[in-house]
Amino acid sequence: MICHRMNKYLVLNILSFFIIVTLCASCGSRKTAGGEQGDTLLMRHAQLLQMVDFGSYTEVSVQNPWHKGQLLHRYFLVKKGAEPDESSLRQRGTVVRVPLTHTVAFTTVHASLLQQLHAESALAGMADVEYVHSPSLKQLCKSGKIVNVGSSLSPDVERIIALQPDAMFLSPFDNSGGYGKVGELGVPVIECADYMESTALGRAEWIRFYGLLTGREHLADSIFRQVETNYQELCRKASQTKTRPTLLMDKLTGSVWYVPGGKSTLGSMLRDAAVSYVFADDTHAGSVALPFEKVLEQGSTATLWLLRYESPLLDTYTLQTLLSEYHGYARMKAFQHGQCYGCDTRSSLFYEEVPFRPDLLLSDFITLAHPELQLGSSRYFIRLPQ
């Protein structure tokens, strides 16, 4: 009887061991319909990306941020020189030969990202070049090494065709109806849905995808690890503060005030900065268009006001400049107490740097909201003079 029980326990232990091993193995691997075994690349923060390495190619699935559970795009990044069954892959998604060497970027964000990855030589064309602030990218555009393909909303298709790009970086939008003639060129479209991630580190982690596309995966991983470390250390410091100042963002554009949604990357960063954002309860992942009266209702008592502006003449932007744009700003407590801080997006690299270096912006938020931490001077925002 004792031997029988011992054998029973032995069998159960062996079965448990194999079940655990099988479960652990399945967490880091995946099989294709054809039986190929791949290694899942763990994404620690990004919710819209899944990447699986199959050796000769990497399968990248981009989830649809507007329709939960649906796929936006599936890519197969095939290393040059590798020979997988491309006809089979093309039936399941878009095949992209990597590393990319001749691309067109429709946003300054992704053009600047290629520069961060030391892959600017792969940038053949670019839209909206008038919004480029990086001196080196400006020079490449001026010299013609990067071709101006016009507006991102109405690009010069003939110029794009002449460039013969191996891929195009575009930002997708909900219900946009596709990419028009650009989407019909037969050139792989990289749908850059990173801006729809709900956290700053989630968006920043997309650098790993762009690293794979450009053959800079090791550099991309290194950059992201450093950003993640910096960001989390800043969060730790902010969480130890005792005050939670109320904060308002941005200002009117025409008759509409676009505020960061409570579920947007900026909204999440403000939470991480240990401030009480006046629209923290909002459920939108992007910007929200509001009339001034609604912002006044919720934000008039905010003690800190951070706003972004463009100064075409690079003149000093003051509280009086702000008031001349709209007299109603005088009703804001932060304005009355001189607690307004501005970022000139024309003269700074705000839009180029922040998407994939959120640690830099988080440092600004914490510096201004919690000066007692003595983090130093802010990088983007300065106090508006009288």
PLM regions: where:
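Bacterial Sec-dependent N-terminal signal peptides
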Residues: 1-34
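Bacterial Sec-exported substrate-binding components of ABC uptake systems
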Residues: 27-111, 219-247, 336, 349, ...
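A short, structured surface patch at a secondary-structure boundary
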Residues: 67-161, 170-172
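Short, structured coil segments at secondary-structure junctions
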Residues: 119, 185-186, 273, 336
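Extracytoplasmic substrate-binding proteins
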Residues: 145, 156, 166-256, 280-281, ...
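Proline-aspartate-enriched helix->loop->beta-strand connector
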Residues: 149-173, 187, 292-305
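Alpha-helical, coiled-coil/dimerization segments enriched in small aliphatic residues
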Residues: 258-291
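C-terminal soluble interaction/assembly domains
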Residues: 279-281, 285-373, 377-385
